[in-house]
């Protein structure tokens, strides 16, 4: 079976990022993060994103940093669903492993800061969420399962193996980006305190183009045929032949008709940001709060025959960026040795997300608790030309046992990450940064009593047809959501590594 699915992996979840933080956040906004993710209390030009108030403790003048990062990621979803055994290429197995591959060769970031005495300002540009593409050569379970359900249904109703295999052509291309520019202004109150306020402009743009076509079924002892013909024949036999197959054919065609999608979603949203920095002796403490960002994606849809309301033309879709609180501390053990800690808390449950199941902006209610992140790292100045650094962080997501918030199209799992790198001091005003950041994701299994809600889906499609046919009570009794539901599960796992190089100037 030929299936090719190209899908951007980001809703919150971002093919190009190391995916630290909330489900829509790329935290690797400067290469310094790769070599030491504990950047919350940093005093440097990268503070334009991580610690805007800390800019107040830099030297007077201009400070600029540019970097480019390269990301490699793999996503592995193992779907266990009994009807998958009918897949022409699945060799009778009721499970299948889907692998998504993503490679982003160059992802740039810019940081700019200016300080004059007590006054200062900063600017940051980067892809805050989304970006990149993931290629799934074998499709995804959520796309294949509804097709797999068709032979399973026919065989159940027939009480025998009437259909032995299925095939289909599935294509989907998706892209999700949030290009963001962040501007902050601040004032150093005294030698200890500095404050800053700013705003981030987010330009969000999502594209989805795809289709489900040419569903085919293989009758027992026969060859692959159009699904509508096989289905019409099967339904006719269930009526005892009282309704001819050619009379049922139009209804059967609707049940297995081709589906297509061509949609563009976009919005411009604003994130207010406030931060404070307290510096005393060898210690530096920071706090940054980003307010919840109201996002209402406007749909411009050329075609949507999928039945997924999220892509209806003219509809507004809630996709808020969660507010988050970021705390940091840095301690200079010696003049050439520093340690840092950080804590990030994301208010995921308070940010509205569109829910296809209810048609309301309430998907966030599926979350068990908000996500959070713990970070730590250290830096050592080997000599006046070289600084070495290392760090790690862990993040925890509150998906809960049923994990209804995530799917094989959009997910991340709790993880532990580590970064290592170096900064080369060309002179007192020019530095070169190198960093590598590796994430070790945990497996997460999502159990489903009705896998992909396919039982409910098939029931809704069949109900209008069944009501027009003289079926026996025994057969009609099998066509309920409860009887059509088949249990299944998805096991989610990812790998990710990011490397980058950057240069910074002061003048």
Region spans (language model):
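Gram-negative bacterial Sec-dependent N-terminal signal peptides
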Residues: 1-20
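Intrinsic disorder/low-complexity segments enriched in polar/small residues
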Residues: 4-5, 83, 183
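General helical structural elements
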Residues: 7-8, 39, 204
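A general structural signal for short secondary-structure junctions and capping/turn motifs
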Residues: 11, 55-57, 112, 266, ...
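N-terminal, post-signal peptide beta-strand-biased segments of exported outer-membrane/organellar beta-barrel
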Residues: 16-130, 414, 437
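Outer-membrane beta-barrel porins/channels
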Residues: 21-34, 43, 107, 115-507
């Amino acid at each position: 079976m030929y299936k090719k699915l190209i899908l951007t992996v980001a809703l919150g979840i971002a093919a190009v990022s190391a995916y630290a933080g909330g489900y829509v956040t790329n935290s690797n906004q400067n290469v310094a993060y790769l070599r030491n993710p504990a950047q919350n209390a940093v005093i440097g030009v990268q503070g334009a994103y991580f610690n805007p108030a800390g800019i107040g403790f830099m030297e007077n003048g201009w400070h600029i940093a540019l970097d480019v990062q390269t990301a490699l990621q793999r996503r592995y979803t193992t779907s266990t669903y009994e009807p998958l055994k009918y897949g022409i290429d699945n060799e009778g197995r009721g499970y299948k492993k889907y692998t998504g591959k993503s490679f982003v060769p160059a992802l740039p970031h810019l940081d700019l800061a200016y300080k004059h005495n007590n006054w200062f300002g900063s600017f940051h540009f980067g892809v805050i969420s989304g970006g990149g593409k993931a290629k799934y050569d074998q499709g995804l379970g959520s796309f294949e399962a509804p097709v797999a359900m068709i032979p399973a249904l026919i065989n159940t109703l027939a009480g025998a193996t009437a259909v032995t295999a299925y095939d289909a052509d599935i294509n989907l291309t998706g892209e999700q980006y949030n290009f963001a520019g962040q501007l902050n202004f601040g004032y150093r109150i005294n030698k200890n305190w500095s404050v800053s306020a700013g705003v981030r402009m987010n330009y969000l743009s999502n594209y989805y183009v795809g289709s489900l076509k040419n569903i085919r079924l293989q009758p027992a002892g026969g060859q692959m045929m159009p699904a509508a013909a096989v289905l019409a024949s099967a339904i006719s036999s269930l009526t005892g032949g009282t309704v001819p197959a050619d009379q049922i054919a139009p209804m059967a065609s609707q049940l297995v008709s081709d589906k297509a999608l061509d949609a563009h979603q976009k919005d411009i949203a604003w994130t207010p940001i406030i931060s404070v920095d307290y510096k005393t002796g060898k210690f530096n403490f920071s706090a940054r709060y980003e307010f919840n960002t109201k996002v209402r994606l406007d749909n411009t849809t050329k075609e949507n025959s999928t039945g997924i309301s999220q892509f209806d033309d003219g509809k507004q879709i809630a996709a808020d960026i969660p507010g988050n609180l970021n705390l940091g501390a840095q301690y200079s053990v010696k003049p050439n040795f520093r340690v840092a800690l950080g804590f990030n808390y994301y208010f995921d449950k308070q940010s509205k997300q569109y829910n296809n199941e209810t048609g309301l902006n309430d998907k966030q209610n599926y979350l068990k608790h908000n996500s959070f992140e713990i970070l730590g790292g250290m830096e050592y100045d080997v000599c006046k030309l070289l600084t070495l650094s290392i760090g790690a962080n862990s993040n925890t997501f509150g998906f809960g046992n049923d994990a209804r918030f995530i799917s094989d199209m959009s997910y991340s799992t709790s993880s532990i990450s580590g970064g290592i790198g170096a900064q080369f001091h060309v002179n007192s005003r020019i530095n070169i940064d190198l960093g590598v950041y590796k994430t070790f994701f945990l497996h997460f299994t999502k159990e489903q009593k009705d896998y992909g809600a396919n039982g409910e889906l098939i029931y809704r499609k069949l109900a209008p047809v069944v009501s027009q046919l003289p079926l026996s009570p025994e057969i009609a009794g099998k066509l309920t959501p409860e009887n059509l539901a088949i249990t299944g599960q998805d096991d989610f796992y990812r790998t990710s590594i990011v490397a980058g190089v950057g240069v910074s100037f002061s003048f």
